[in-house]
């Protein structure tokens, strides 16, 4: 939710992210957005009836809950690739391992990875120190240029939009367990990556200063 009144902290973080989004693509400094979501795992207790002409597939109202899985979305909007990592939990340790995967597997040749994410409490360099010895934690901290969306401004994180695409195209049905979820998400991810699906961010700082003028402190 966008704040209803002037909020200097919000506009400062918003303009920081918008400045990042206005930069030209630099392969040595790739832009990567990160966000998380969860998926309730639900198994069918009876075999669903398949769809027929004029009639959708039917599922029994009884089902079995199999817990919740977490999904970390890494999205490079200017390069058109994404990677979704499925985990059992959503902790500082899980987050730290995702960042190491991003650094060493997906962007090993980058001089610096420009990282945009929301202000969740685990999205901090401290998480790396919880997960790894200090020299490794420091190495990883310095691999990133850290940027945060403002509080109540997660819509500025392009990974959130990509999670919405994942939810509508892949997760809008019952999925029984983590293994099936990981398989389905990987298939979706590979299809999107094959087509280099990018994000074309349009909202700029100049537009924000007009359309969201009420959020800016006013001066005589």
For each predicted feature, which ranges?
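C-terminal domain-tail junction helix/linker
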Residues: 3-9, 45, 180-220
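Extended, low-complexity cationic-aromatic segments
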Residues: 13-100, 212
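Mobile genetic element proteins and their domesticated derivatives, centered on retroelements
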Residues: 33-35, 74, 80, 99, ...
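A short acidic (Asp/Glu
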Residues: 42-44, 124-129
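RNase H-like polynucleotidyl transferase catalytic core
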Residues: 58-64, 136-158, 173-176
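Active-site proximal helix-loop segment of RNase H-like, two-metal nucleases, encompassing DDE(D)
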Residues: 82, 151, 159-178, 191-195
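Short, basic/hydrophobic alpha-helical segments
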Residues: 93-114
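Acidic/histidine-rich, metal-coordinating catalytic segments
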Residues: 110-124
């Amino acid at each position: 939710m966008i704040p209803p009144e002037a909020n200097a902290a919000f506009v400062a973080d918003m303009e920081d992210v918008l400045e990042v989004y206005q930069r030209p693509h630099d392969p040595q400094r790739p832009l990567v957005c990160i966000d998380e979501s969860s998926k309730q795992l639900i198994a069918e207790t009876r075999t669903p009836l398949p769809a027929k002409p004029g009639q959708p597939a039917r599922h029994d109202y009884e089902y079995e809950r199999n817990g919740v899985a977490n999904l970390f979305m890494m999205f490079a909007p200017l390069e058109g690739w994404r990677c979704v990592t499925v985990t059992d939990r959503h902790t500082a340790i899980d987050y730290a391992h995702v960042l190491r995967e991003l650094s060493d597997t997906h962007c090993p040749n980058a001089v610096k990875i420009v990282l945009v994410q929301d202000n969740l409490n685990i999205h901090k360099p401290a998480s790396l120190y919880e997960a790894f010895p200090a020299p490794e934690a420091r190495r990883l901290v310095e691999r990133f240029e850290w940027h945060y969306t403002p509080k109540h401004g997660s819509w500025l994180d392009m990974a959130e939009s990509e999670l919405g695409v994942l939810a509508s195209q892949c997760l809008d049905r019952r999925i029984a367990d983590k293994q099936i979820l990981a398989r389905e998400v990987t298939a979706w991810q590979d299809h999107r990556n094959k087509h280099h699906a990018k994000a074309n961010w349009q909202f700029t700082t100049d537009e924000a200063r007009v359309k969201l003028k009420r959020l800016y402190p006013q001066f005589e």
